[in-house]
């Protein structure tokens, strides 16, 4: 790599121009990268919930409601007025209330209690609405909130997605505002110049910006990738810059001229930087082995980010160092890092004890990490009372009960089995209602006698749709057990010709896919990183020792 070090210094101007052009491109490209907030879109194409969702969108014109709106302390007349106003908002496709189920001109005492309490309870009204989740979603939600004002509370899948969109960018900014000063402080303590930390951050920041801009060539990235890529790239890449400038400082102390010192620093540090970078890249690329496509999405972006970080450190940082070495010299300070000589002696003495302790706790830690509870979708934000949307969701749930809809699609030519499966589903824990042709209309009534608009919600040309409501959070044990039991019943009555969709089925499939992916990605990462370490150190024992130490620390941490 000696030639690269010399060529880099020789073509300083060209390197500055190339990086400047990439930065200019990225400044305009990064804001235009499409962000996907639907976790279910990253399931394998052959997963049951994905196939089911595609079929439902093809066979049925309308999806189930995705917004719940509660109005507090309103009369029937006031509720109808609010419903009328909300229905006129752009993006609101449909809104339902009590008047769509019963004749509200009759006295409330005459209305079935369960039906009444589902829509109007203790002077509180609950609407369900279907809104377009496209580019107008944010404005639609804002318009609804503006109309209902202080009297209203808005929740549901569409609101959760909108919250994810708005909160993600805000949270990234908060994290960056917190972590950058911390990094600067740590770097100031660990370096020998007040200016070096800002040079590090500038170099890595350039690589982060370029990585963000080049994401436009991927078409779209997930909101998880968008939220974590920059922070992870910053955390992982900073070491490369520190390696190089520490070497530079050492050669300057030996009396070498600036250019000679930076060339020697590049030659001496390239091996450690490249081997470290390569192990990181391969670790991230191991995520591409996942069937759950969040893995490849995140892995490719992060691996690409490390490549740009390596290029920035190996090409841009040496050039910037040559241009700014006078500032580095003027802002030089003594090292604030303590001597680790005593620590190293203590570590060597207690090393055998530490090995014994780790050997004792590592297996229980491995078993314990398998018992961790994970969340698999954006709905976890709605179930957390730490967020405003979580508080709003709880308030609606406390008044009208939880409402989690699951769609089961079955062949339309078998009404007897449809009715029987509906009766069995009704006995599943958590199920509060089933809307289907056989259940709400009746198989004895010919389809020709049912209004076309109502019929199309439940029956298409080949399939019948059952909309099942369960009183449980999307990712709760009750919901997952319900999905499992419904799938078993679907297979019992219709073989493989049944389809199940909704938030809970998608989260269930994500959980099953991620669980199976975990073994593959872990093995892939271990093999790839082990090979790199083996080639770097030309040893068989060192990779084994390092990987055992790394995996043990991961299990203990989890």
Residue ranges and their predicted role:
Residues 45-158, 373-542, 548-558:
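Structured non-transmembrane domains adjacent to transmembrane bundles in polytopic membrane proteins
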